[in-house]
Each structure stands twice: as structure tokens, then as C-alpha cells.
Amino acid sequence: DLKALLIKAGYENVMTYIQSGNIVFKSSEASKKTLTKDIGEVIEKHYGFAVPLLILTGEEVEKIIKKNPYNDGKKDASKLHVTFLDSMPEKKLLETTRDEKFQSDEFYIDHTIIYLYCPDGYGMTKFSTMFFERKLAVTATTRNWKTLLELEKLATMKDE
């Protein structure tokens, strides 16, 4: 499995969450660019196909959690999601996308992070990963709020 593959590749304290490609690990390599390249090569060599990767430090995950404008205790946390963009979108695309509306759904773009609040559920929103990829011309991935909180817990455990 992926956990064993990364341990074999030399990564430490490897933990996975719900078999969805969410991994927490420790590495002496500080460059996220190098880590992305190296892990991408390990995965492609083993599985025979490339996958887009997004690597965040534990500190980045904590910051993302703290900055969520919808995590105010007034909104149902099960309706919160975060979309991660692989790069900063062009200003013009950001401006036109910010004006999009859909029912009572809300989103807030903070550089390469999009905070989503979907009161009717993520499955009912037009603000999907594909929507943002298409509108912003980037690669993206979305996680629900619970997953993000669990990844933060795993990252904290890793440091103990």
C-alpha cells in the first residue's frame, strides 16, 4: 500500500487517513518542490501512472484551519470544505470567479486556498473542484473540514 511504499522510500512516521491519498509523514527534506518530485516518482514507478500531489507542512494546515472565515461556530462544520489550488490563479480569473453565486453556498478565496460553505451539502453545490479548476485554470483538490482536522491531529501526533 501507499504507506508501506513511502516507508520503503525513506519517509518516517508515515500515517494515512481513510485511504484517500491523505498522508502525513516526516522528512529531512525541507523543499516541498523536491518532496513533490520525489514522491511523485516513487508513486509513478510503483503504480505505473502519475498523480498530482499537494504537500503542506503541519504549520500550513494549522494556518488554513485558523483562517477559515466560516468556522465561526455558527455554521455546521460538516458543511465546510477547503479547496487547495496548485498555483495562484490569474487576477482576472479570480475577479470573475469571486462574483459567482449558487443558492446559499458561499466561498472565500485566500491566495491558493478556497474556503467553502455548502449548507445543502458538497454534492449539491456547483462549486466543485472541477468548477474551480475550469474557472481559475489551475489544478485543485478538495477536502472536507473533518478530514483537514484529522490531518492536523495526525501531524501533531507525528511531532510528539
Where are these regions (language model features)?
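Surface-exposed, charge/polar-rich loops and edge strands
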Residues: 1-20, 24-160
